[in-house]
């Protein structure tokens, strides 16, 4: 693999429009326990799964086309992704999160890891009938809408409250959740929670507390102390990815750095974990492209 990666990088440096690879078809060994790089067959060639080639494509910031069979092998084509890395969370402009704009093209619920990990977090929260659920930075309410799939018998009894700076995001929420028991408002979450807000049973904030235009830790402490019931749970989401040409790219990348740097992400995770543990919550962390931290009652 080292020589393959080096050759592909050289081709991209020379601004190749695509990379063509002829590789072994791994299909005959699909039911066997074989590790990538393990010698197989009479020629003792290194085994490489399609997942490895997909990972190579991601490392190169490319999109892999559908493999085409050719004489017992596969032809792979890798195409450089267009555009620039998208990091809306670093912008101070609320319109960047317009659900009808670029941000609206991103559907995290199409990521199986996101769905699986979010569901694992919800299972730790023990949501009962008539639960009150608060979302800070709600956008179009994806994290609320998906609850219908996992709580079919109690979903209609949940009441949702969501705040966001984007007027268009709040309009989307009103369309998705028209019932009068739900509350969605344009609000700066840096402000204190509304005094009339009932105590909530679950606070959700996904990819919001890391925005550069708010003091995320201070905001969280305020809402945690003033808006939640003593037995409430918390689910926080932290982006561990960016987007390039419509593809999710693994790893949190800082500006002016060509590679992922998880240092800020790890620092934030450790802060929120310690804070919630100090306040008597059981805390766990999971995730891939998005890391979830869940704090639930012990």
Task: State the predicted function of each range.
Residues 1-90:
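N-terminal accessory interaction module
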Residues 68-127:
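Class I SAM-dependent methyltransferase Rossmann-like catalytic core
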Residues 134, 142-191:
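Class I SAM-dependent methyltransferase SAM/SAH-binding core
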Residues 139:
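Conserved glycine-rich SAM-binding loop
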Residues 194-203:
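A short acidic, Gly/Pro-enriched loop at the edge of an enzyme's catalytic core
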Residues 211-223:
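A short, conserved alpha-helix within the catalytic core of class I
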Residues 231-240:
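Conserved beta-strand signature within the Rossmann-like core of class I S-adenosyl-L-methionine
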Residues 247-273:
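Conserved Class I S-adenosyl-L-methionine
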